[in-house]
Design a protein with these regions (language model features):
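Intrinsic disorder/low-complexity segments
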Residues: 6, 23, 39, 62, ...
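Low-complexity, intrinsically disordered short peptide segments enriched in small/polar/basic residues
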Residues: 1-4, 15, 105, 109, ...
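N-terminal intrinsically disordered, low-complexity, charge/repeat-rich segments that act as generic
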Residues: 1-71
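Intrinsically disordered, low-complexity, charged/polar segments
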Residues: 86-101, 138-173
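Basic/aromatic-rich interaction segments and small domains that mediate binding to polyanionic partners
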Residues: 115-152
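Mixed-charge, Lys/Arg-rich low-complexity intrinsically disordered regions
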Residues: 69-108
Length: 173
C-alpha cells in the first residue's frame, strides 16, 4: 500500500511546474511571431508568458499588451491558443507517479465514494496518473457504462467491500 505521508501531494493545474511546462511549449512559436514583426525583443519572454498565462488566447494576448506593451494580432492569439495546460499537467503527474513510485491501493471491483460521487465501483485504472475509473451506482442503475476518473487519494473505500463482506445490520448474521 502507498504510504501517503511520504509522498508529496499530487501536482495541481496551477502549480508553477505545470505552468512552466505549458509555457515552454509556447516559447518557440511566440519567439517566431516576435522575430517576424521585429517590433520588440522582450528581455525574458518565458517569464512574461508565465506572468500573463490564460487559457484563452485572446485574453492571454490582451494581458501581454496591458502588462508589457505587446502589440498582439490574430497570429499571436492563434499561438497563445495552443496553450495546453491539461497536457502539461498530465506530463507532470506522470513524472510524480514515477518519481515517487505511487501505487493505487484499490482493486477492480472495490466500492468507493468521494465528496462528489455518492458511490461507485472501480472498473479500471490509469496507473500512469494513479487514477481510478469508477462507474457510479446511478450510471449502473441507468444501464450506462460511463466512468469517472478519480485521483486515487480522493477515493474513500466503502466499508465492508475491500476484502470482506459488509456486516449485517439490525439482525442476526
Amino acid at each position: 500500500m502507498t504510504e501517503i505521508a511520504k509522498i508529496p501531494p499530487r501536482p495541481k493545474y496551477h502549480d508553477p511546474v505545470v505552468v512552466e511546462r505549458a509555457v515552454e511549449r509556447l516559447v518557440k512559436p511566440v519567439q517566431e511571431w516576435i522575430d517576424l514583426r521585429a517590433q520588440f525583443q522582450p528581455k525574458d519572454l518565458k517569464s512574461q508568458l508565465t506572468d500573463c498565462i490564460h487559457n484563452n488566447g485572446y485574453e492571454y494576448a490582451k494581458e501581454l499588451e496591458e502588462r508589457y506593451g505587446w502589440e498582439p494580432d490574430s497570429a499571436l492569439v492563434e499561438c497563445l491558443d495552443r496553450l495546453d495546460i491539461q497536457s502539461a499537467h498530465q506530463h507532470v503527474v506522470r513524472a510524480w507517479v514515477t518519481l515517487y513510485s505511487v501505487k493505487i491501493p484499490f482493486n477492480i471491483g472495490d466500492r468507493v465514494c468521494t465528496p462528489t460521487l455518492r458511490a461507485g465501483t472501480v472498473k479500471d485504472f490509469d496507473r500512469s496518473t494513479a487514477q481510478l475509473a469508477v462507474q457510479s451506482d446511478e450510471n449502473r442503475d441507468e444501464g450506462k457504462d460511463y466512468r469517472t476518473l478519480i485521483d486515487f487519494e480522493d477515493a474513500i473505500p466503502i466499508l465492508g467491500t475491500i476484502g470482506e463482506a459488509a456486516p449485517a445490520e439490525g439482525g442476526a448474521a
